[in-house]
């Protein structure tokens, strides 16, 4: 939604859903994570760093999660690793209405260097890796899962 239509209530709702809920969940599990050399994976969006028109609300909330990621990675090291995935548009129930039109879906896919939209497994497999011991030397990272959209033309 354009900035001129953004309300404080819109911002509050998005921040509660994305940032405050993450903080609350992490606080609730912090001791358990610390005692078990745990790992946290947060979810941002390519919109937090790329800059898209009409993404004021979600980009702000997701950028806050990216800040939270690096701050908590520093605070919790060495006992808890914290990373963040930043996917681009992914085929899902949430994006279904946007992708109804084949023309729109094709245009959105072409905006990505890999010429397709994301699938749930694209992010899930990386999250699984980050939560495993195989990623024991990775923390404080924002990882684009975006078909190259954030870094390539």
What is the predicted function of each stretch?
Residues 1-3, 7-12, 104-108:
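Substrate-binding pocket helix/loop in short-chain dehydrogenase/reductase
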Residues 112-123, 134:
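A conserved structural motif in NAD(P)-dependent oxidoreductases
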Residues 45:
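Residue(s) in the substrate-gating loop at a strand-loop-helix junction
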Residues 26, 61:
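Active-site helix of classical SDR
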């Amino acid at each position: 939604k354009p900035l001129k239509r953004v309300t404080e209530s819109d911002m509050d709702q998005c921040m509660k859903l994305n940032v405050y809920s993450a903080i609350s969940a992490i606080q609730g599990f912090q001791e358990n994570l610390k005692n078990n050399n745990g790992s946290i994976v947060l979810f941002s969006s390519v919109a937090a760093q790329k800059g898209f028109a009409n993404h004021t609300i979600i980009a702000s909330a997701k950028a806050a999660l990216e800040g939270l990621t690096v701050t908590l990675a520093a605070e919790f090291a060495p006992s808890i690793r914290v990373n963040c995935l930043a996917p681009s548009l992914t085929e899902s129930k949430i994006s279904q209405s946007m992708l109804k039109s084949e023309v729109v879906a094709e245009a959105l896919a072409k905006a990505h260097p890999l010429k397709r939209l994301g699938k749930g497994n694209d992010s899930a497999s990386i999250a699984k890796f980050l939560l495993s011991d195989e990623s024991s030397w990775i923390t404080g990272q924002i990882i684009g899962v975006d078909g190259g959209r954030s870094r390539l033309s």
